[in-house]
Amino acid sequence: MTAPITLSNLNHWFGSLHALKDVSLEIEAGEYVTLLGPSGCGKTTLLSVMGGFVDPTEGKILIGGRDMTNVPPAKRPTTTMFQDYALFPHMNLRDNVSFGLRMSGMGRRERHDRAKDLLELVGLFAEAGKRPNELSGGQRQRVALARALAVEPKVLLLDEPLGALDLKLRRTMQDELKTIQRKVGTTFIHVTHDQEEAMAIADRIVVMNEGRIEDQGTPTRIYCEPATLFAADFMGEMNHIPGRGTASGVETPFGILPLVAKEQDPAVVCLRPEAIGTGKGDVSLGPATVRDAAFFGTFCRAHLIPKADPDRVLIAHLPPASLLAAGDELILYTKAEDFRIFDVKE
């Protein structure tokens, strides 16, 4: 079971705080969408509005084509999975998973069979008789997911479900969430502030900032071709180079770059750290001195002082075998296609 969601012109105020500002969004049935943004951007408020825990001040919510704007949570085809999991400590896993089915009046045998199927789906069939305090954090997270899916919601809302897990377990659970979502086909809407998590699991990322949607698209598009400077910066490290449009390109401390901008208008030229290299490229950034460098396993992260702009620090992700030391001299290159340019106000 699954359903599309349509959000139309949502606005919400908490007193004088305008938490959601004209938010409109279409989510397809069976899609895995992440709401990504910093604390206070409105992503959790938007999730709460979809779940019925907050009534929007203005706007409309359709789920499966039906108006759910003022429908209470219990009567919506949605289930919300919170970060703290909220498992019942006195119940075993089977009873935790089947609790919602019991409340809906399903017979004992049928709900226990359903619970066993879901525990098998999340890899905990053999642990059905255990209680939550006998499980690891990752196992409790999987039980909470099984319980949320037991009532067969058309939409599953996940409020930072992996936030309490350590890095290694979080990455494992990212893979499991994506696999389980593909198997059940339910629409998943997942709130996170972690851009790597969003890229790992989402079909589509919705970047939020100050109550508005800044950008939305596939992880590849959002990372490689962000629509706004905020989205570019929030999706990962980004080097900023000041520029100004001219008839022949964009004038920067590194010379005229082959980019298009309005003449005389200021601009910010952006370049990802992994786009900077020491091999040949079609654009030279000239010589630079290593300020410091650190080994990150798959790359060497270096802070570089370019000769062309010594007051600026460039961040580069260079090959892990680079073995850089402070004071080393490098010649930097990049590709014209890796630049992104954004207009700015003086």
Predicted features along the sequence, with ranges:
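ABC ATPase nucleotide-binding domains
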Residues: 32, 48, 73-230
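ABC ATPase nucleotide-binding domain
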Residues: 6, 26, 62, 331-333
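Conserved ABC transporter NBD signature motif
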Residues: 59-67
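The feature captures the beta-strand-to-loop junction immediately N-terminal to the Walker
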Residues: 36-38
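Helix-to-loop junction immediately C-terminal to a conserved catalytic motif
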Residues: 51
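Pre-Walker A (P-loop) beta-loop-beta motif of ABC nucleotide-binding domains
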Residues: 23-34, 88
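Non-catalytic connector elements of ABC transporters
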Residues: 238, 248-346
